Amino acid sequence: MYKYILFDLDGTLTDSAPGIMACIRYACEKMGIECPGDSVLRAFVGPPLMDMMKKTFSLTDPEAEKMLAFYRERFSTIGLFENSVYPGVGEMLSAVKSSGKKLALATSKPEVYAVKILENFSLSGYFDAVTGSELSGAHVEKRDVMALSMQKLSAKKEETLMVGDRKFDLEAANELGVDALFVSYGYAEKGEEIPYRPKF
């Protein structure tokens, strides 16, 4: 019986791809880099952005930091709100909360942005804890934010369920010994979840 439910944000509760992709395009323009097509940009939804920028554009750490600063320049004021809640999410969170579960948000997105997004969509009240990365780059790995969320809730791993849409969520759940529920409507590539064998 699960008492603690951890939720990913992007691709699980909200469709944030439009804002993220627009901000990557903006950062590419600022950096003078040719921007790839949408199929490549969609891969930026979910994983830590610095890692994706270095890998996709062959950037050094300082170059990736500069690109991330340009990304945040637009995201913090515009991109964050180019986002929508998936149908039924509010009702689902309400039902889970009403059943007596403790809920936490566990996202690699900076916590300061995650809080604003939840507030913007009136979802804050469902969560007992919100955990994201720091703007400094700390706690950017999914395992770290999940572990911190569990710490905030005083959650035992055998009583915890992670809900997410990407391999990063499932891999982190496996590493922490937590069951996972994979949502298929998010940003995962076809079959991405199979090697991680989520419980649901």
Question: What feature does the model see in each segment?
Answer:
Residues 46-77, 87-91, 95:
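A metal-dependent, Asp-based hydrolase signature
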Residues 77-105, 111-115, 143:
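Short, acidic loop-to-helix structural element flanking the phosphoryl-transfer center
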Residues 162-200:
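Acidic, Mg2+-coordinating phosphoryl-transfer loop and its flanking beta/alpha structural elements
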Residues 4, 141-171:
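Conserved Lys-Pro-Asp/Glu-containing loop-to-beta segment of HAD-superfamily phosphomonoesterases
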Residues 1-43, 54-59:
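Active-site neighborhood of HAD-like aspartate-dependent phosphohydrolases
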